[in-house]
Amino acid sequence: MSTFPPTTTVFNDGYIAETYEAYRRDPSSVDESWRQFFRTAESLAGITGATPAGSDPALLRKTAGAAALIDAIRHYGHLAVQLDPLGTKPPGAVELTPEFHGITEQELADVPASALGYQSGTAADVVRALRGVYCGKIGLEFVHLGNEEERLWFRRTMEEGALTRPLSLDEKLAVLRRLTEVDGLERFLQRAYLGYKRFSIEGTDVLVPMIDEAITRGAQGGARQVVMGMAHRGRLNVLTHVMGMSYVEMFGEFEGRQGETSADSSTGDVKYHLGYEGERKVGATTIKLELAPNPSHLEVVNPVMSGMARAYQRMAGAQDGRNERLVLPICIHGDAAFPGEGVVPETFNLSRLRGYRVGGTLHIIVNNQVGFTTDPIDARSTHYASDPAKGFEVPVLHVNADDADACIAAVRLAVAYRDQFAQDVLIDVVGYRRWGHNETDEPAFTQPKLYELVKQHPTPRQVWGARLVSEGIVSDAQVAAIDKEFADKITAVYHEMKATPEESTDAQRSAPSAPAPDPATAVQGETLESINTRLLEWPQGFKVHSRLAKTLERRRDALHTGAIDWGHAEALAFGSLLLDGINVRLSGQDAERGTFAHRHAVVHDVETGVTHTPLATLPQSRGGTFEIYNSPLSETAVMGFEYGFSTAAPRDLVLWEAQYGDFVNVAQPIIDQFISADRAKWGQRSGLVLLLPHGYEGGGPEHSSARLERFLQLCAERNMVVAYPSTPGQYFHILRRQALRADRQPLVLMQPKSLLRLPAAASRLEDLANGGFLSVIDDAAVADHRDEVRRLVLCTAKMYYDLLASRPAGADVALVRVDELYPWPGDAVAEIVDQYPNLEDVVWAQEEPKNMGAWSYVAPQLRVATGNMLTIRYIGRPERASPAEGYSKAHEEEQKRIVAEVLNPAPTSAKRKTSKV
């Protein structure tokens, strides 16, 4: 980003003089960098009273060299900062030497500072001052920022020094007390619970006062809530000293003293995964604090925390970028995971997108210089652990974890930047890990030299205390007294806890709660007609694509012709919920149009490109808002974001849609660690809806299966709902049921692709205006002759319509749709089975291979439903390694085989059993 010719340092005085003469004859004949250089030199000549600057090429060379050196200090100064508390020398950079720029230290004194834009002194004075700024305590990387205003802000702020000032006497004492608490807690836990894992903060203790400063600065800038995400390292200290968890609560986690639990919902989690909510007073302002719970899957909490922050900003009034200061997100990373885990850049990529931005996140890397047993040389391909962030134009501040002054100054600078530009900012805190990966691990096995240094190195509290002693602020005796005061306090709390009898877990355990009745989901026909009319109104002069206009116009009559398709039913469901005051948010790849062009929630003017979102124009007197966004091409980060949003906004209907259901497994950690187990582990609740296009239509092994079997395998304790609606009306009702339920679980919906416009699957207005969602749908076509049915076939949506289209008239086969697979509708299925007195067998038919789909899950359920009195048969694809055929002809043949086998007459040799087996 130099403002001077990059090559002047290698040119001799004569060349510079020749170039200057050419510039004087015709400024356009030389490069702009030379023109700027000569303008500066001429200004210098005027200030010094010299004759034309070209008459003194040596002065030109010195000025150019000084300017280039100053530019290099801003650019490379971070490489000269002493960052490692253990003493590793900084690498430096040859560009930081005057000689590299064709000038000596002595010659710097020949250049007036005024020639470089400074008021007094010489270039030597300027260079000395800037070395103190950029090569001193904070290593700043900012020249990669594309926005010149941001670069100039950092230059001005760093060089003026208001935000990087040293701590005051009171602040230094407060930091000493804080570091004493942080260090004292870890030492006490090591003694009281020797051998327990706690993933201590020791070596980067300064993280706690840094977060303290971020909360204070955020509050002063208008924040009223702080949302945090972090891994296990240092979490116990953050829980107690930042979030406000009492020492008694923390000791209870070590002692196994659980709080109130219910018999059917809580298995709990280890203490260093726990979330927490607290608050803190900053002056007269109360700041809400929330630490998101997280699994051991490093960095996967990042998008979850971002989604929570976005939801809180929306609820606090933030919309379209307004009031983003109300919620400050803070994300704590590890030095090995930050460059190693793909979810990190995925989440950074969300930071500037309209559907996901949160007005900037404060990122802090807790840099231990080792990942478990892996050295940085094997952990990353970059110099700094933080380097991936630079690709997203995130400024980076590097600090030494033993220098609390620098660390807190970096926080001031970072929060001020975030407040000014509403962008992400990162602080890399270089420290060490006093113990192994956990306290039972021996790190000297793999890092013997490093841990010899660690063993000899004083703790951050000792380093800071010694500094204050050397400055005459406190005495050694006072430092020791502060330490003893805290040790006595925490010991007394521990003994008091030990003396308090533990309540019986059985006494605390409450009875399992019964599921609440389903809410009414039908909507009056007049209301649906009104919504439909509004959704088909365009702004004056708006030009819709002619083909799309015809498609949407069909929706005007569909309510009366019985042709409501999938996208239409969804729009009516969303519209009715908005009128009920329920916010709706949907995102996913191509979600605005829909992968299969079935939604068109956002329409585009073909002449101007202006967009119109009909659902966003519905009357909002009760507060319902509609958001829909095309997501970036990411599953893990976007699903994680929407999950986090759903936990923070529990009354909103939040949906994530996969482009194809096959791609949902890219986000498997979000499903396994959060969606399916959050309530059991952390008592956290989410009503997130996953829309997963699923169905075998010849698309091959990557465009057929949403891996239904994996979701069913995760189901237990009513932790989620897994459904496969067979009609638009069913889809309408289950969406409304999900939004209106008082106690929601995540909803996983298989979306039948080929049914989106299938006439046989269309719904009528009456289907939406009456009734509700049906878990199981009996075969109405055989209702008047059930006694003639020999084979009862249970299946899901897509399979049902394939069978229905091929079933001959008078067949003795009944087709029953199971639209809700979990919770399994056992009573309803058993009731249907009982209505067919002459059954000879029950078939589960599916498109998926036998080792996939629902078969393994439903087989034991069907044995219960039939009382083990009927033969249960499987018909579908055989067990396979790949979910579907890659050739369309093979697909068609297999599909025909399945249909034919299902619809064959039931074998007469198999009779209904007369007793249970």
Segments predicted by a language model, with ranges:
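Extended, charge-enriched "interface" segments that sit outside catalytic cores
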Residues: F4, L44-V206, A223
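Cofactor-binding active-site loop characterized by glycine-rich and histidine/acidic residues
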Residues: R224-L397, F596-A649
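Conserved phosphate-handling catalytic cores of large alpha/beta enzymes
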Residues: G371-T382, K390-L426, V430-G436, A444
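Flexible, glycine-rich loop/tail regions that form catalytic "lids" or insertion modules at the edges
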Residues: R61-D71, H78-L108, A113, D125-R128, ...
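Subset of Sec-pathway N-terminal targeting signals
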Residues: M1-T40
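Active-site pocket-lining segments that scaffold enzyme catalytic pockets across diverse folds
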Residues: G184, F188-V248, K550-D557, I564-L578, ...
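Active-site cores of enzymes that catalyze phosphoryl transfer or operate on phosphate-rich substrates
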Residues: L163-L185, G256-G317, R322, P614-L615, ...
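Alpha-helix capping and helix-loop boundary segments enriched in small/acidic/polar residues
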Residues: T7-V10, P57, R198-D205, K288-E299, ...
